């Protein structure tokens, strides 16, 4: 997994319900924990763009509901700054369901994704239609 050059603020707390924007059948997922999160004692884990999270499917097809899966944050409302000075924010928060290696389980991603996600997870970048 490649490092992200931008300093991404972690805007999504554990317990947040986030829409899933791929065609796997999941509509809304809840963040359970964040992979490779290092925080202090008793601090709730939080995620930002490009972070892989353990999620539970709350709304979706009956086969997908109540499953515990991995997902990557591809959009967040919280503004973040790129090294060239550009500030980027999206209209909504969004996640894509993946496997351990970051390969998306769906074949289509709705809406734009951040360039930082495409750099860290190239397979998500090839699946996405728009990269911002």
Swiss-Prot record:
Top-level taxon: Archaea
SUPFAM superfamilies from the UniProt entry: Ribosomal protein L14
Keyword Repeat: no
Gene Ontology terms: cellular component: cytosolic large ribosomal subunit
Coiled coil feature spans: none
Single GO biological process annotation from the record: translation
Pfam families for the chain: Ribosomal_L14 (PF00238)
Keywords, ordered alphabetically: Ribonucleoprotein, Ribosomal protein, RNA-binding, rRNA-binding
Molecular function GO labels: large ribosomal subunit rRNA binding; structural constituent of ribosome
Keyword set includes Ribosomal protein: yes
Family (UniProt): Belongs to the universal ribosomal protein uL14 family.
Function noted in UniProt: Binds to 23S rRNA. Forms part of two intersubunit bridges in the 70S ribosome.
Assembly information from the UniProt record: Part of the 50S ribosomal subunit. Forms a cluster with proteins L3 and L24e, part of which may contact the 16S rRNA in 2 intersubunit bridges.
HAMAP family: Ribosomal_uL14
Name under which the protein is recorded: Large ribosomal subunit protein uL14
